[in-house]
């Protein structure tokens, strides 16, 4: 697991590392409500799920083949990479492969989280973010939910959304 500021070089593919060379600490992530853990054993994930009342989960494999071919895969990656927020926490545990979550810091800069097998990331509701795979084009992830599984992405800007407003208030305190 590695965290750093995104280089914002739009001339390079979104699946490239985009490492600016400016690292981000766990403390910086916590200030924006992002939690990160490394759990080599799924039993650790089960304990966290019980503590945080995640009652549902599913698994998703993202590859060109799993998405029905290269064209569908590329369309899906574009959707994942559009900046958005959710009204629920987003919890992802990487079972295999590699992917990137980008989140906005308090100054609206992108922080990139490089996640590999065993890494778990919790994004608070209301945080602007996006997701993409690495250049390996493969990830197998577990999604955890506190209620029935849903994935409703609200594209930016939705600053008047009550979950967004609550999030901004929480990180401004």
Swiss-Prot record:
Cofactor(s) of this protein: Fe(2+); Ni(2+)
Pfam family, one: ARD
Any coiled-coil regions, as ranges: none
Comment on bound cofactor: Binds either 1 Fe or Ni cation per monomer. Iron-binding promotes an acireductone dioxygenase reaction producing 2-keto-4-methylthiobutyrate, while nickel-binding promotes an acireductone dioxygenase reaction producing 3-(methylsulfanyl)propanoate.
Binding site for Ni(2+): 84, 86, 90, 129
Disordered, as annotated region: 1-21
Keyword Iron: yes
Keyword Magnesium on entry: no
Binding site for Fe(2+): 84, 86, 90, 129
Catalytic activity of the protein: 1,2-dihydroxy-5-(methylsulfanyl)pent-1-en-3-one + O2 = 4-methylsulfanyl-2-oxobutanoate + formate + 2 H(+); 1,2-dihydroxy-5-(methylsulfanyl)pent-1-en-3-one + O2 = 3-(methylsulfanyl)propanoate + CO + formate + 2 H(+)
Keyword entries, A-Z: Amino-acid biosynthesis, Cytoplasm, Dioxygenase, Iron, Metal-binding, Methionine biosynthesis, Nickel, Nucleus, Oxidoreductase
Top-rank EC class of the record's enzyme: oxidoreductase
GO biological process, one term: L-methionine salvage from methylthioadenosine
Molecular functions per Gene Ontology: acireductone dioxygenase (Ni2+-requiring) activity; acireductone dioxygenase [iron(II)-requiring] activity; iron ion binding; nickel cation binding
E.C. designation(s): 1.13.11.54, 1.13.11.53
Superkingdom: Eukaryota
GO cellular component, one term: cytoplasm
Pathway recorded for this protein: Amino-acid biosynthesis; L-methionine biosynthesis via salvage pathway; L-methionine from S-methyl-5-thio-alpha-D-ribose 1-phosphate: step 5/6
Compartments, record wording: Cytoplasm; Nucleus
HAMAP family, sorted: Salvage_MtnD_euk
Family: Belongs to the acireductone dioxygenase (ARD) family.
Record function comment: Catalyzes 2 different reactions between oxygen and the acireductone 1,2-dihydroxy-3-keto-5-methylthiopentene (DHK-MTPene) depending upon the metal bound in the active site. Fe-containing acireductone dioxygenase (Fe-ARD) produces formate and 2-keto-4-methylthiobutyrate (KMTB), the alpha-ketoacid precursor of methionine in the methionine recycle pathway. Ni-containing acireductone dioxygenase (Ni-ARD) produces methylthiopropionate, carbon monoxide and formate, and does not lie on the methionine recycle pathway.
Protein name (database record): Acireductone dioxygenase
Organism field: Yarrowia lipolytica (strain CLIB 122 / E 150) (Yeast)
């Amino acid at each position: 697991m590695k965290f750093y500021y995104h280089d914002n070089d739009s001339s390079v593919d979104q699946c490239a590392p985009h490492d600016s060379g400016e690292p981000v600490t766990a403390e910086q992530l916590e200030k924006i409500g992002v939690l990160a853990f490394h759990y080599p054993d799924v039993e650790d994930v089960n304990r966290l799920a019980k503590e945080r009342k995640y009652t549902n989960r599913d698994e998703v494999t993202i590859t060109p083949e799993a998405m029905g071919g290269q064209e569908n895969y590329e369309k899906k990656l574009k959707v994942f990479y559009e900046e958005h927020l959710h009204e629920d926490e987003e919890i992802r545990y990487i079972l295999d492969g590699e992917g990137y979550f980008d989140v906005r810091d308090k100054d609206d800069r992108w922080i990139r989280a490089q996640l590999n097998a065993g890494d778990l990331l919790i994004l608070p509701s209301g945080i602007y973010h996006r997701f993409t795979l690495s250049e390996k084009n493969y990830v197998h992830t577990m999604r955890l939910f506190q209620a029935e599984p849903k994935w409703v992405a609200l594209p930016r800007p939705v600053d008047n959304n009550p979950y967004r407003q609550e999030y901004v208030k929480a990180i401004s305190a």
